[in-house]
């Protein structure tokens, strides 16, 4: 599923667009970076995974990983459903809760309702989640994970397993370190040590082929989503 081979339209380049779609003739004529759009062959199955463990609540009440993640998931669900994709949702904290893939406005309502009720609690590892859902996901489906990437030693194994099965993995990671530092709950030395550890983890995940966006608090949602394009 995805784009077909029939040319549909030209549009201006957006950061994150594949250079393979660049229309160099249009660029030569106009001086503007333009990309080719193609007709879509069929809908894709999109899986949104939200980390709602206790750690996702780190930071101020209105500015923490869970708040940012649910907001991003709501925007992504609306976007994908508007283009006729099928969207499913998984949240994991003290338990694993899933919404089966479906399309349309009714599905958007179901997803938004589930996201609005997400609570931060528990500590279910990501690997337990991926082991549970893998048998029920079509191979190659885009998987978008929203997580602070903290306090979970199974993250690398989970992503390695997904990539080994050719899943297209995107990770939007609101940084709890930034929330804590901004709220003056973390001193500079502690921040620098933990930031280095986080940078190493993100580098490893990218090395596995995952598209990872390190989402800092001041970064607008649209910027974070553009930075994580490719799904």
List the model feature ranges, each with a label.
Residues 25, 119-123, 147:
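Short, flexible loop segments at the rims of nucleotide/cofactor-binding pockets, characterized by
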Residues 1-102, 142-146, 152-153, 158-161:
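An amphipathic, basic-hydrophobic helix/alpha-beta surface used to engage anionic
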Residues 133-143, 149-231:
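Von Willebrand factor type A / integrin I
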Residues 16, 93-95, 121, 175-177, ...:
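Short, solvent-exposed coil/turn elements at secondary-structure transition points
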Residues 67, 120-127, 192-196:
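Conserved phosphate-coordination/catalytic loops
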Residues 103-141:
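Von Willebrand factor
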């Amino acid at each position: 599923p995805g784009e077909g081979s029939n040319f549909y339209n030209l549009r201006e380049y957006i950061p994150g667009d594949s250079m393979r779609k660049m229309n160099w003739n249009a660029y030569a004529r106009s001086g503007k970076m333009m990309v080719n759009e193609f007709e879509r062959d069929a809908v894709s199955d999109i899986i949104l995974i939200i980390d709602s463990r206790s750690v996702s609540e780190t930071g101020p009440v209105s500015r923490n990983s869970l708040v940012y993640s649910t907001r991003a998931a709501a925007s992504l669900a609306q976007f994908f459903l508007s283009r006729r994709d099928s969207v499913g949702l998984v949240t994991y904290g003290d338990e694993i809760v899933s919404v089966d893939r479906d399309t349309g406005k009714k599905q958007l309502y179901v997803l938004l309702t589930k996201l609005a009720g997400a609570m931060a609690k528990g500590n279910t590892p990501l690997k337990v989640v991926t082991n549970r859902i893998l048998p029920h996901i079509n191979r190659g489906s885009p998987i978008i994970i929203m997580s602070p990437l903290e306090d979970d030693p199974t993250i690398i194994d989970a992503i390695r397993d997904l990539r080994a099965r050719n899943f297209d993995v995107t990770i939007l990671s609101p940084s709890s370190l930034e929330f804590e530092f901004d709220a003056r709950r973390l001193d500079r030395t502690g921040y620098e040590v933990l930031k280095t550890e986080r940078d190493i983890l993100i580098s490893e995940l990218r090395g596995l082929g995952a598209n990872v966006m390190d989402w800092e608090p001041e970064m607008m949602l649209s910027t974070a989503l553009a930075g994580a394009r490719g799904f």
